């Protein structure tokens, strides 16, 4: 009995030790990611490429560079970022809704998920190869001196380097999910965006200092950033609580049940994924048209890429529709109203005024549909903020919308994950303490 306090302390410390190791792993992975973004692709003049990216400010290439954490402007092997993997994941998930074979794999549990993950990796290689070929063939035509020695050797090494970099990031993201905290892919996207924040802030302040931007405009931008951040936090914490009651039942001489609780449904159940998915889906064809369009034979692609530049009406329309679509798609992939209704029925719970079973499922689905529409419109509104700002004040993408939403939501999710790990370790410690007391008695 005297050993119980010491045992509890060791249990708590072991739980905190695991959390510490997971946090250190995430930090280490982000450091590796950052170091990798400085490893150059052979054959490209990085200084000339940085000049080119600066000239492309406000275009799809600028946005592509933002998501890669500036790796594109440094001609890094990680220039493609994690976007090819995200695009591949979207395609495989979409195919799973129409392909009976993939649909069956989803029902096979862990074994089926491993096969789907394998197909996603294969698709990632395909998407990364297509984008790498587009970049390697488009770069020599964009600026003189960018690629000093154009030839098969350059094309081969650049494509292999870029595809290898993407596959490494895919593996790193999976390791963060498994051995770290949170969703590894979201954290890598977050890391890429945050890496460019300091330079973007300093650049904007420098614009104001040199008189290119009125100080009041700078203050207004800061106020908008804080207002959007507050709005994002407010909505992300918002819930629609459905009242649930438990029927009274007799077990021996005891009356169990008879109490009520709530079924919480988030306003934005899809989280930040619609914004990431929509950006990935637009970036893939838009960058292809941008790179391939540098060839005189495909000049029409260059004209199309101009229409797909951020802030253009076509881009805004496609982006808004994609966000709404992926809000419904991702919510449907992650949450099943029928399963929730069945679980309530099995536990003896019901929604007042709604019959258990099919009617409960339809009611939850109706509520989720309304919430998803509200969540999709909210994400669309937040993501369109930067384009209004850039067109009015020539501010970089980092200051609003997609990037701000991703940063805030990933931080919030990360904090929740850390808290759940702490609560889990405390819960395990309490259980072990109770078991020791029972053993002592």
Curated annotation (Swiss-Prot):
One Pfam family named in its UniProt record: SecY
Main subcellular location: membrane
UniProt feature coiled coil, ranges: none
Record GO biological process: protein transport by the Sec complex; SRP-dependent cotranslational protein targeting to membrane, translocation
MF terms (GO), sorted A to Z: protein transmembrane transporter activity; signal sequence binding
Record keywords, A-Z: Cell inner membrane, Cell membrane, Membrane, Protein transport, Translocation, Transmembrane, Transmembrane helix, Transport
Keyword Transferase: no
Disulfide bonds: none
Subcellular location: Cell inner membrane
Sequence similarity: Belongs to the SecY/SEC61-alpha family.
Function: The central subunit of the protein translocation channel SecYEG. Consists of two halves formed by TMs 1-5 and 6-10. These two domains form a lateral gate at the front which open onto the bilayer between TMs 2 and 7, and are clamped together by SecE at the back. The channel is closed by both a pore ring composed of hydrophobic SecY resides and a short helix (helix 2A) on the extracellular side of the membrane which forms a plug. The plug probably moves laterally to allow the channel to open. The ring and the pore may move independently.
Subunit: Component of the Sec protein translocase complex. Heterotrimer consisting of SecY, SecE and SecG subunits. The heterotrimers can form oligomers, although 1 heterotrimer is thought to be able to translocate proteins. Interacts with the ribosome. Interacts with SecDF, and other proteins may be involved. Interacts with SecA.
The protein's name in its UniProt record: Protein translocase subunit SecY
UniProt organism field: Haemophilus influenzae (strain ATCC 51907 / DSM 11121 / KW20 / Rd)
């Amino acid at each position: 009995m005297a050993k119980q306090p010491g045992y509890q302390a060791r249990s708590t410390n072991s739980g905190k030790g695991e959390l510490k190791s997971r946090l250190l792993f995430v930090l280490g992975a982000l450091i590796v990611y950052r170091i990798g973004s400085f490893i150059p692709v052979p054959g490209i003049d990085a200084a000339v490429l940085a000049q080119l990216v600066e000239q492309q400010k406000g275009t799809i290439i600028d946005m592509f560079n933002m998501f890669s954490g500036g790796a594109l402007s440094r001609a890094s092997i990680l220039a493609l970022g994690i976007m090819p993997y995200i695009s591949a994941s979207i395609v495989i998930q979409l195919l799973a809704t129409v392909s009976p074979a993939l649909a069956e794999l989803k029902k096979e549990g862990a074994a089926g998920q491993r096969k789907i993950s394998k197909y996603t990796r294969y698709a990632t290689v395909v998407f990364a190869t297509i984008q790498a070929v587009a970049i390697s063939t488009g770069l020599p035509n964009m600026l003189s001196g960018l690629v000093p020695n154009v030839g098969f050797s350059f094309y081969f090494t650049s494509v292999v380097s870029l595809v290898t970099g993407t596959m490494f990031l895919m593996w790193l993201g999976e390791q963060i999910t498994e051995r770290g905290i949170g969703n590894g892919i979201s954290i890598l996207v977050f890391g890429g965006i945050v890496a460019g924040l300091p330079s973007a802030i300093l650049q904007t302040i420098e614009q104001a200092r040199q008189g290119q931007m009125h100080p009041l405009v700078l203050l207004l931008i800061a106020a908008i950033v804080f207002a959007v951040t507050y709005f994002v936090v407010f909505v992300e914490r918002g819930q629609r609580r459905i009242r649930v009651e438990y029927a009274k039942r007799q077990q021996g001489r005891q009356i169990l049940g008879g109490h009520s609780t709530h079924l919480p449904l988030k306003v934005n159940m899809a989280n930040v994924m619609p914004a990431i998915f929509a950006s990935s889906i637009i970036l893939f064809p838009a960058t292809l048209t941008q790179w391939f369009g540098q060839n005189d034979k495909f000049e029409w692609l260059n004209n199309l890429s101009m229409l797909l530049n951020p802030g253009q009406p076509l881009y805004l329309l496609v982006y808004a529709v994609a966000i709404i679509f992926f809000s419904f798609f991702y919510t449907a992939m992650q949450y099943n109203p029928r399963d929730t209704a069945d679980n309530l029925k099995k536990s003896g719970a019901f929604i007042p005024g709604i019959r258990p079973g099919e009617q409960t499922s339809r009611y939850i689905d109706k509520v989720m549909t309304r919430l998803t529409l509200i969540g999709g419109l909210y994400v669309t509104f937040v993501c369109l903020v930067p384009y209004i700002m850039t067109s009015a004040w020539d501010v970089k993408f980092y200051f609003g919308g997609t990037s701000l939403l991703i940063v805030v939501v990933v931080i919030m999710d990360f904090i929740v994950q850390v808290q759940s790990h702490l609560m889990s370790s405390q819960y395990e410690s309490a259980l072990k303490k109770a078991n020791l007391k029972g053993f002592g008695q």
